[in-house]
């Protein structure tokens, strides 16, 4: 047999056994090429407009490379260890280490760059679909075209050639460092099998569960008023991160073994074949794979969490725009409003107008704060708030000595939570007007120009408002003191009104807002974030799922002898598959459930920073991630089925 024939035979064998690796490699290349193609697409100029958009795309492409590189190196490590006996045989028949390395390199070259070419072709084919998805998410009215980008091809080839160089280096070091004898023991020694549960396992296992639960508990208190200074907040975040990650490692290192051993003891040693194939195998293997499982679980939680938060922001974009701009159009200058209304009247567009006088006042709120805010560089006892008269609000009516708040942002409430009632003071230039605070309402009545994006609006009686008008502090007043809201009666005429809004020659330097454009701006920002996070999350899901699948391939080959014995003892293929299915539920389910749990507590602790709806976006992301992740568990069961079938 010639060397070339040997290479082709090995290549054929590897392609047959490692088809999922080839698929994952092609998929990774396709994603990267499609992603880089977007950066060179002229139609993407609006999305990448500004430093932040372009930087986000470039950062995402770097993270994509890091994920793919880590996966390929880890997968290559699994495969070369699996071929250790084959490498040992090559050396036993007289091949030098250099020759063995050249054979491996030639095989990898054909397999790798063949997959690279296939991946580029797939990436080119899906690039239009990817662009369409991005345009849809960001709300851009653009036509996606199918075009081949030479710069994207060059960048992809350079990046994956460098990754190939790292793979060659890893293979070279492996072949050089191993002796012939050690090559025949690599597989058997790669996983440390535990023969019995020790006291150390019980302690580690208990610590793991407690550490995770403590991290969850602290995260639930993160923005609840327990940590009132920036220093303690930062320390708490670091503690949560460390506690959960270390707890996850200890969980795999000891908790799984400990818990499953309790189940086994409860059965008093009467284990069915299903239990032998599932519980025992998982007990002995998860401990040795604790590090990689911890990494997969942690990054899965991170990916699910980030995708949930970005989807929460995207999902809440319209509601957020309504909070910032409570009418279809808001203006802050009467003359500009007159120009705009004149244009609407000229085109027969009916509208409703709301005019609200707004003053800015210092409000002493110390007595109604739930907790004092420490560690900040401003006086938290005093808020600079917009103030309006109650006659401007149909649903609120206050007495001369009373005041109410409305439109307080959820995020601000987490940091500066208010009591239901108490005493406040409205401070003018010289006078102090004491008021009884009677509660917080949910309506948003003036634009973000007055509310600074999250501060509440104070509603007072006409008498109190007049007193403030006579004693205003000019140093804190804005350039405008009037809010004009215009709502189009017929929604079908809204787009025409937006065009007129842009054509109106506004003369004031104070801002004017269109709600629909604020919503589009929010969707464009968060749509890009969701697209990038989704892209990275999908890449990690595919690569981590493949790693778990490859581990199951190795385990199935190692346990093939056991299946042969069990088949000879009379157990059917169906009997064995019952245990295998349970095993895969645990092998894939435990990292998935832990990742989902980590992401749930992370998202729940700070979701209000990103939007005003938690459950629907988060559940949708989790269900989608679970469905895609389950595919690899199903593939593992099918592979085991093939191994069991071949066992006799």
From Swiss-Prot:
Biological process, per Gene Ontology: response to antibiotic; transmembrane transport
Principal localisation: membrane
Sorted UniProt keywords: Antibiotic resistance, Cell membrane, Membrane, Transmembrane, Transmembrane helix, Transport
Segments traversing the membrane: 18-38, 60-80, 110-130, 150-170, 199-219, 232-252, 290-310, 528-548, 590-610, 618-638
Localization, UniProt: Cell membrane
GO CC entries: plasma membrane
InterPro entries referenced in this protein's UniProt entry, alphabetically: ABC-4_Integral_Memb_Prot, ABC3_permease_C, ABC_permease_BceB-typ
UniProt superkingdom: Bacteria
Protein's membrane topology: Multi-pass membrane protein
Family from the record: Belongs to the ABC-4 integral membrane protein family.
UniProt function note: Part of the ABC transporter complex BceAB (TC 3.A.1.123.5) involved in bacitracin export.
Oligomeric and partner information: The complex is composed of two ATP-binding proteins (BceA) and two transmembrane proteins (BceB).
PANTHER family from the UniProt entry: ABC TRANSPORTER PERMEASE (PTHR46795:SF3), ABC TRANSPORTER PERMEASE-RELATED-RELATED (PTHR46795)
Protein name according to UniProt: Bacitracin export permease protein BceB
Native source organism of the sequence: Halalkalibacterium halodurans (strain ATCC BAA-125 / DSM 18197 / FERM 7344 / JCM 9153 / C-125)
Gene (UniProt): bceB
